[in-house]
């Protein structure tokens, strides 16, 4: 089963992305602060994208859907926090 990481995953676009991939049979992980209810069927990685402290370094994802980035610095910093991954969207 392919593993996908979705940043956010509780509101707006990221919620629907997480739901879509759960329904498509992916193993879906969401990264968020756990301040809102989670989509049924996802696995929560609780954290703030701006202060991850290496929690993703030992994980592999086939796809990373970074929905919550606002600028290039957000993207660069997040990619540097990731372990290995296949595709980054």
Give residue spans per PLM region.
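Residues at the starts of beta-strands that form the adenosine-phosphate
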Residues: 3, 27, 86-87
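Active-site-adjacent beta-strand anchor residues
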Residues: 7, 31, 68
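Basic side chains
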Residues: 2-3, 33, 49
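Conserved glycine-rich Rossmann-like NAD(P)H-binding loop of the short-chain dehydrogenase/reductase
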Residues: 27-33
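N-terminal Rossmann NAD(P)H-binding glycine-rich loop of SDR-like oxidoreductase domains
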Residues: 2-24
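NAD(P)H-binding glycine-rich loop region in Rossmannoid oxidoreductase-like domains
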Residues: 36-38, 43-87
């Amino acid at each position: 089963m392919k593993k996908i990481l979705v940043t956010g995953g509780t509101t707006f676009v990221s919620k629907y992305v997480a739901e879509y991939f759960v329904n498509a049979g992916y193993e879906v992980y969401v990264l968020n602060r756990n301040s809102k209810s989670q989509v049924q069927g996802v696995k929560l990685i609780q954290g703030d994208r701006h202060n991850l402290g290496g929690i993703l370094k030992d994980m592999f994802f086939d796809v990373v859907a970074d929905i919550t980035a606002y600028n290039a610095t957000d993207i660069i910093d997040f990619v540097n926090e990731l372990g290995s991954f296949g595709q980054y969207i």
